[in-house]
């Protein structure tokens, strides 16, 4: 979607510009509650980007390098809820917290594994609706590698009836079931020390996210699918020794993870107007 635009990324052009629109957490509060970005908003955003860049180019990612962003990202969320959501804090910030507070004994790997598993679970749950077959229909129709003769089968009766066909519905259900199966397979492999099952789970999420990525879906972050593959192989493929039960060594971290990954999304599914699914 972005090649027609130069540069092909533009978040900073909004968040680093005074006067642009924002959604403060405490509307009307002095200094932080305005509906347009001021120099405090810009300064904290730019500072966070520079701290992240320092961590990216550093020889080693340490808690000391991550700690400024550990503090700044929630602060930026208070200043602008939109910024907190577009930062994908429900995923990236949760893992950053694990890397900041649990790096000493590598418990952050177990925390990241828990995050990945819940992300797969809730992503699969979000597909259990009546409109997802239509999503599949358009995504596959736009995909450059999907056979042309199958593209027409995605529609009920092309070109007269452009609703999702049974074929598209079947693909949608298969996709949701595949995504839900990923954490089940990986956790079962960890519980049974089954290396073949672990590799099968890794191949499953590679195929799942890779399939989405190569179809160039509109309106969704392709880089997230790449990260799920890369992170999944690192966490589950190369670190089978890190178990979720290890998190009991840090009960406060475990409680915070369960609150963020289980409780908040559950509330959001029942009260979507109150709690964003991106939390």
PLM feature segments, named:
Residues 1-279:
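Alpha-helical membrane-anchoring segments
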């Amino acid at each position: 979607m972005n090649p027609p635009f130069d540069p092909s990324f533009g978040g900073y052009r909004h968040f680093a510009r005074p006067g642009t629109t924002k959604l403060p957490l405490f509307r009307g509060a002095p200094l932080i509650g305005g509906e347009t970005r001021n120099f405090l908003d810009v300064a904290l955003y730019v500072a966070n980007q520079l701290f992240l860049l320092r961590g990216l180019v550093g020889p080693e990612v340490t808690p000391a390098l991550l700690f400024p962003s550990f503090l700044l990202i929630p602060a930026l969320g208070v200043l602008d809820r939109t910024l907190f959501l577009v930062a994908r804090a429900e995923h990236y910030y949760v893992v950053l917290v694990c890397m900041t507070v649990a790096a000493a004994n590598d418990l952050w790997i177990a925390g990241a594994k828990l995050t990945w598993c819940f992300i797969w679970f809730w992503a699969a749950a979000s597909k259990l609706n009546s409109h997802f077959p239509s999503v599949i229909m358009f995504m596959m129709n736009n995909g450059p590698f999907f056979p042309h003769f199958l593209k027409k089968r995605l529609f009920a009766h092309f070109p007269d009836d452009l609703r999702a066909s049974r074929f598209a519905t079947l693909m949608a259900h298969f996709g949701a079931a595949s995504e839900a199966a990923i954490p089940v397979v990986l956790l079962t492999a960890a519980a049974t020390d089954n290396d073949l099952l672990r590799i099968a789970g890794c191949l499953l999420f590679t195929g799942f996210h890779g399939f989405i990525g190569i179809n160039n879906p509109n309106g969704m972050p392709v880089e997230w699918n790449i990260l799920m593959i890369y992170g999944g192989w690192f966490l589950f493929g190369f670190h089978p020794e890190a178990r979720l039960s290890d998190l009991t060594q840090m009960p406060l971290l475990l409680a915070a993870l369960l609150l963020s990954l289980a409780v908040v999304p559950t509330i959001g599914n029942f009260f979507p107007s109150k709690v964003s699914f991106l939390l």
